A protein has these predicted regions:
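Extracellular glycan-interacting surfaces
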Residues: 1-254
Length: 254
């Protein structure tokens, strides 16, 4: 079994969820025992898990083939949500994956999904309907330094190769995304995006991940590398919502 994602309940460190090609599993004892949550995958596998910030029974699970399932009763029943695959999606050597999801803590009905390699979709009604919000990324790819392709001849591919997104409780409605070309921010729920400019702090700009601290919503961590298959990597931290960043992986050997 290959575990693609692990998610921890913020208010209960012993409760974790693990997603794989075999299913969704839950532990309430810190990993000593696991239970299958009964999510039928078909030909899909799980790549992301998002927990509702206030309702412990509501969970979103992102799969490949641009599919998302949701439970509102702790896994007793699951609903396949009517997600959409953006027209700009670029299936390469694997189906488009829902690689990361985020729920706005200030309005949990707002759910956002980052697709690899496919762009960005959002729901403003708890997953009942979805919108393709990828066009702003396509527009950004028209800037010469943001044009990039590996799997296709589409210069927007790099901008649509989304790896992570997150929302901090300290910034309601503000979305951060990490993709192949760096870090990007939306101040209007994904209607428009601007390049953050992580290259001012790091020579490595391939965005792997970005996450807020569970202890301080003003703190973010960003993982960067040199390329999809490269060996170089770095870890940065901001304590002021991205106004400045410091590298924190000095003197670490893996």
């Amino acid at each position: 079994m290959q575990v693609n994602v692990i998610e921890r309940r913020p208010d209960n460190p012993s409760e974790l969820y693990a997603g794989s090609q075999l299913g969704l599993f839950k532990t309430t004892d810190g990993g000593d025992s696991w239970a299958d949550m009964g999510l039928e995958l078909g030909e899909c596998e799980i790549f992301s898990i998002s927990l509702h910030p206030t309702d412990a029974n509501t969970i979103y699970v992102g799969l490949d083939h641009t599919k998302i399932s949701k439970t509102t009763d702790g896994g007793a029943n699951w609903t396949k949500l009517p997600t959409i695959q953006p027209e700009s999606a670029i299936p390469g050597c694997f189906p488009v994956r829902v690689l990361r999801m985020a729920i706005d803590p200030s309005n949990p009905e707002e759910v956002y999904a980052a697709l690899e390699v496919g762009g960005f979709i959002r729901s403003l009604d708890g997953g009942a309907t979805w919108e393709d919000m990828s066009q702003p990324f396509v527009d950004l790819s028209k800037k010469p330094h943001l044009a990039n392709h590996i799997l296709s001849d589409n210069d927007a591919e790099g901008m649509l190769d989304l790896h992570a997104l997150t929302i901090s409780a300290a910034q309601p409605g503000v979305i951060w995304i990490a993709n192949r070309l760096g870090l990007f921010i939306s101040d209007d729920k994904g209607e428009s995006w601007r390049e953050y400019g992580i290259d001012h702090y790091s020579e490595l700009t391939y965005g792997r991940d970005i996450l807020p601290s569970p202890h301080d919503p003003n703190v973010f961590y960003a993982a960067l590398s040199d390329s999809a298959r490269g060996q170089a990597g770095s870890l940065y931290r901001t304590s002021n919502l991205g106004k400045s960043w410091d590298r924190i992986d000095h003197d670490i050997t893996i």
